[in-house]
Amino acid sequence: MGSMRKMSSSFKRGSIKSSTSGSQKGQKAWIEKTFCKRECIFVIPSTKDPNRCCCGQLTNQHIPPLPSGAPSTTGEDTKQADTQSGKWSVSKHTQSYPTDSYGILEFQGGGYSNKAMYIRVSYDTKPDSLLHLMVKDWQLELPKLLISVHGGLQSFEMQPKLKQVFGKGLIKAAMTTGAWIFTGGVSTGVVSHVGDALKDHSSKSRGRLCAIGIAPWGMVENKEDLIGKDVTRVYQTMSNPLSKLSVLNNSHTHFILADNGTLGKYGAEVKLRRQLEKHISLQKINTRLGQGVPVVGLVVEGGPNVVSIVLEYLKEDPPVPVVVCDGSGRASDILSFAHKYCDEGGVINESLRDQLLVTIQKTFNYSKSQSYQLFAIIMECMKKKELVTVFRMGSEGQQDVEMAILTALLKGTNASAPDQLSLALAWNRVDIARSQIFVFGPHWPPLGSLAPPVDTKATEKEKKPPTATTKGRGKGKGKKKGKVKEEVEEETDPRKLELLNWVNALEQAMLDALVLDRVDFVKLLIENGVNMQHFLTIPRLEELYNTRLGPPNTLHLLVRDVKKSNLPPDYHISLIDIGLVLEYLMGGAYRCNYTRKSFRTLYNNLFGPKRPKALKLLGMEDDEPPAKGKKKKKKKKEEEIDIDVDDPAVSRFQYPFHELMVWAVLMKRQKMAVFLWQRGEECMAKALVACKLYKAMAHESSESELVDDISQDLDNNSKDFGQLAVELLDQSYKHDEQVAMKLLTYELKNWSNSTCLKLAVAAKHRDFIAHTCSQMLLTDMWMGRLRMRKNPGLKVIMGILIPPTILFLEFRTYDDFSYQTSKENEDGKEKEEENVDANADAGSRKGDEENEHKKQRSIPIGTKICEFYNAPIVKFWFYTISYLGYLLLFNYVILVRMDGWPSPQEWIVISYIVSLALEKIREILMSEPGKLSQKIKVWLQEYWNITDLVAISMFMVGAILRLQSQPYMGYGRVIYCVDIILWYIRVLDIFGVNKYLGPYVMMIGKMMIDMLYFVVIMLVVLMSFGVARQAILHPEEKPSWKLARNIFYMPYWMIYGEVFADQIDLYAMEINPPCGENLYDEEGKRLPPCIPGAWLTPALMACYLLVANILLVNLLIAVFNNTFFEVKSISNQVWKFQRYQLIMTFHDRPVLPPPMIILSHIYIIIMRLSGRCRKKREGDQEERDRGLKLFLSDEELKKLHEFEEQCVQEHFREKEDEQQSSSDERIRVTSERVENMSMRLEEINERENFMKTSLQTVDLRLSQLEELSGRMVSALENLAGIDRSDLIQARSRASSECEATYLLRQSSINSADGYSLYRYHFNGEELLFEEPALSTSPGTAFRKKTYSFRVKDEDAKSHLDQPSNLHHTPGPSPPATPGRSRLALEGPLSTELRPGSDPGISAGEFDPRADFKSTEAAPSLNAAGVTGTQLTVESTDSHPLRESKLVRYYPGDPNTYKTMKSRSFVYTEGRKLVRGLSNWSAEYSSIMDQAWNATEWRCQVQRITRSRSTDIPYIVSEAASQDELEDEHRGSLLDPQISRSALTVSDRPEKENLLSVKPHQTLGFPCLRSRSLHGRPRSAEPAPSKLDRAGHASSTSNLAVMSVVPEGQNTQQEKRSAETEC
């Protein structure tokens, strides 16, 4: 960290020095000063090329050394250079220069252009400088994981399925954890596969992963294009096939090019890369988590150097876990094999040890000593087997590479469970935490699985203040205050102490998950035993409010607005500040618990006296009425004494999910808020509170001119919570109507003693109020105890006007009420029971149908009258009738002549207004808020209250003036006349009770607001015309207030159609006098001069009327129309919402209307005074609200909460079922099932292929046994003395040199089921290397295999009886095409053979990695006058799981043969040429028919069908050989005098004489790569469309074609065969 500070300070100094380009130029100077390149300055000629230096560059490309001194060297390198002065070294022969290559790359040549940042640095650059560059200049965030990919440098093929799984897993691991990927950078080997995965990801998603390529500068193709300082360079990704250099991979985002002065050599990047990885691992993931950045190595394929890298990783301190991708080839497969069969200590049994040594030798073409060295390194790696994780595609427990990487990190680092949890939390991988950490579920983990040391925790516990964490530990076992000492004694138990540490780790993880907004982790931790009531304390909640992590929020701005002062950036937000913010956002009479006196006292005791001083500045020291003398002070002292700061329960919350949900809402964490809303009690109230808070925050953000998206997002969040509240209400209403109504009206002690209905009204949630449950509740409340179904208004009016009709109305009992408080219910029930008991003795009951009438009769007359007048509907009509009477009297007063003293009618009006004013004062004083100022503020938020205030104030002023003498009495009367307008407008409030008129009242209010904006626009147009017109027509006006009137007077009336035609043009009308300069009228009087510009007035007026009358007025109409339809669509909800306000208003009003309401006021005062006296005597609590509120006991409240939680669970269960039954979900599930089925089918196909291969192996072994038995029979015949000449024609057999020891059973690649293949393996002594190219070729070389057969000419002129061999003969003869070899059968025609001659068949096998030429063998014998002919069959040799290319047969020119009869020869690749079709069992093959007559022999190609097993050499049975001998013998007896040489052989042109073998369709893996631990991988080459099936090249026999032809003809035949296209 010190070096980081030095770099940052040097960077600052550079930026200060640059005065022209600021920080960019300073950063550029810092880069050039810090980073260097390396150049070779001494030429040491190479032994291979004298024109080239040992560094790889040409001698003329070197630059001279700096004159300042010798090149920079370091200690160890210098000593090495001195001791080995003859060798070239980086330290001695290179010099450092400031880097000249850094900037931005633009890749060209691909499908699309990517950009990447790059820099050329020296191989010994300090890693802290590189990290500073990456974080500060490249603007990269520190990773939470570092994946270092290692593998083969040369290009190799991966199985398509494995490549897909590898790419997806790597990308997913990097995406979900925010990882960096380190690779070699150049587009070869494993880097190309990583680049393909990155390319697929970047094409499917917008963001690019951070892939950093660390490549050697000397191996980069086109590196000259990169030279430049802070430049943007175009880079071509097309590589030169003749160059040894490699291009950079265009899928990477950053490149670090390590330079050690060499060219064309790897190794410069190894040390730099390892040091940089080590330095990054020392960095912390974030400030909250103490974990360093974890590093993991990913091995794909690779050579011996990869094994050394793995060992280096495992020996690091701390060790780096390694993930090996099995099935990718070479080093990865060897490591996987060793990991599978090694014991924990790195011990392997002898048989597997020998097999592994042979595998290493064959794979890397190593000698025995080299293979032993590499084997030792592998065994050293296996000593730390637990750090190596092998990914096998398809194996159980490993779905993808991503899980293997993250699991390896958790297990390999040997970290404790809390540290592993921190890593999983940093990666945001809840699946890893669930499967690897919480393996025991909610149960406690076993002893020893939790690793944090005890001592450090204990010391921290002693040093830390009494924070939430330490308090949490105290309550972890549920102890009380008096048992603290016992708790300390119990901590000596290691098990309990370990569990206590685990609890603390879980709580810390919960805090981190909340801060980092990890909803899934919060859910996981709650499921696994985190007690939220134990977890959440006051300090922790404050820490959550003050966090800077997570999504951005506007809480700081809200606190600043509430405190009305500028806050410092590091201001610590307290819970009391949060309480003020909540009260500000909720509005109305809402009172937060954080601002109550009890909480402030607790807060003061916990945190000292500093923060309450801030409360006094805010005026929050006391919200209750002033204290009464000494008693209040004593109570306050007692409260302070009772609070025990050391008790952990004091600083905790009763409902922690309430507090956390409010925190999530204020911090704008919607997903977290929704999750916390589901947990805990009072879900409906929480949803309504969140809806109100979000809506208020959206309003604040829109007024603060923040980004519109913020306000829109907050508004959407508000709608989401509002919808949740409605859905929950609907769910509970479906289950139980009565309990649902209780949910709406019960008292919410945690939410300012409010109710759900009040919270919905505060949030203006119309849909909630318009719900059926809410409306039923309001209807019950509106009707009181009256039971009226039809014409309730008419019945109520009749009851008011004719009181005796009240006795005929129906009333309800208290059992039918759904809104009354429990106290009122009990009182009413007691009264009814008393009445029933009193009337019970009067008579007996007659039947069930009379019960209702008896109940009605049981209600006394006084109760009926009282309940009638207390019903809100009766109060409404009573007040309405009274108000209409008042308006009639007011009309009469102002319409008739007003005397000096008020008339009786006027006194009634005055008394009405005065009593109404007293009622408004009563409303203010009896409202919910505590402070008088807050009461007035809340009261003024209602529009009609403002109207009443203005109207009453005007009337009072008018009444005072009216009582005075003239002229003040006249002024008072005028005020009366204006004031009655407001009282008429007040009638609109009465219309709100009507379903049809109510929405229109709201429309009028909205249209008035729209019209205010329109008036502003109209004012601009009106003034522009009015001022111009007035100035033109009246240029000589004197200053006067009439000017302002004249500006607006005429233009305003023109809007309504009054155009003042006589004043449009002053001189066009006859009524206006003429004017002119130096002109006189008829009487000789001088005319007045004309007003200049008067002709402009008509034109201006035309434009004005066009804009004002047509444009603006129609615009206003359109706005009104839009408002109308907007309100009309929600008219039902609007009316129901207004109905609530009306019902609540009349529910709380006294029974008598003004002016008789003064009697009700006197009654209320008397009851209040008597109630206070009774309280003093009995010590009762405060009087509870008389509103729509239900007071429940603790037991009833608990049952109600349980019902609400059940409804929440049922609601989400229904939503989940609905989502699963949706079409999109069904399509997704079907797609997953189809994909799983396809994978299963692929596995079945692989198993079937394995079974086929196994059957082939069995067939091969059987054929070998059969051949051995044939040899034994032959040996026995020789021993028995049977004549050898009789058996010459019988059979020719190919000998098999493959013994049983060469058949090794190996595990199939990428298979978890242990599939096996049996393959041929040959000793090294059997390999024939006759060319240097072949001897240096790694992998499987040509295998020598001898096949013996016999050729005999039955003619007396030529007779041959000797074996021939199948062997590879390299030479300069005409080449065969790659992938083919030629099989030549030659036979001498001379009866005199040279000693040691070996006529036979020449064949060449090929290796796909080695270039070679296989040619025909030269004729073995050439006698004078006699030449030999040859039958050439060209074929492709292959191994198991290889595709065969083409098989052709090239006969020579027509020859004369002498033969006996027709015979069919069957040839297939990998099988003998046999006669007959008796034992043939292949799938596809060809038949070469030879038709004989006296003069010619013709060849014909046909196709036959065979069943299976094309890859096993077919061995002729003894029975078939015997039949062949008999046919030969019978043929010779038919015409013994005719020799074969006398017959003519001619080609059949229509058949083209081709021997074609079709490809094998079902057997093997045609697209996969065949691998063996004992050989190099063999990749399947693309076969042409004409190419045929896969098969084995094995042996040939029974080829006997002899002729006597001229020598020239034979040469011509060879020429044609060589020129033929293969």
UniProtKB/Swiss-Prot annotation:
- Activity control note: Inhibited by extracellular zinc ions. Inhibited by intracellular Mg(2+). Activated by the neuroactive steroid pregnenolone sulfate. Negatively regulated by activation of GRM6 receptors in the ON-bipolar cells.
Topological region Cytoplasmic: 1-875, 964-973, 1028-1099, 1172-1622
> Keyword set for this entry?
Cell membrane, Cell projection, Coiled coil, Endoplasmic reticulum, Glycoprotein, Ion channel, Ion transport, Ligand-gated ion channel, Membrane, Receptor, Sensory transduction, Transmembrane, Transmembrane helix, Transport, Vision
Domain of life of the organism encoding this protein: Eukaryota
Check the record and name the InterPro entries matching this protein: Ion_trans_dom, TRPM, TRPM_SLOG, TRPM_tetra, TRPM_tetra_sf
Catalytic activity as recorded in UniProt? Ca(2+)(in) = Ca(2+)(out); Mg(2+)(in) = Mg(2+)(out); Mn(2+)(in) = Mn(2+)(out); Ni(2+)(in) = Ni(2+)(out)
Question: To which protein family does this belong?
Answer: Belongs to the transient receptor (TC 1.A.4) family. LTrpC subfamily. TRPM1 sub-subfamily.
The entry describes its oligomerization and partners as: Homodimer. Interacts with TRPM3; the interaction results in the formation of a heteromultimeric cation channel complex that are functionally different from the homomeric channels. Interacts with GPR179. Associates with both guanine nucleotide-binding proteins G(o) and beta-gamma G protein dimer; implicated in directly regulating TRPM1 channel open-state.
What is the designated name of this protein? Transient receptor potential cation channel subfamily M member 1
In the record, what lineage is assigned to the organism producing the protein?
A: Eukaryota, Metazoa, Chordata, Craniata, Vertebrata
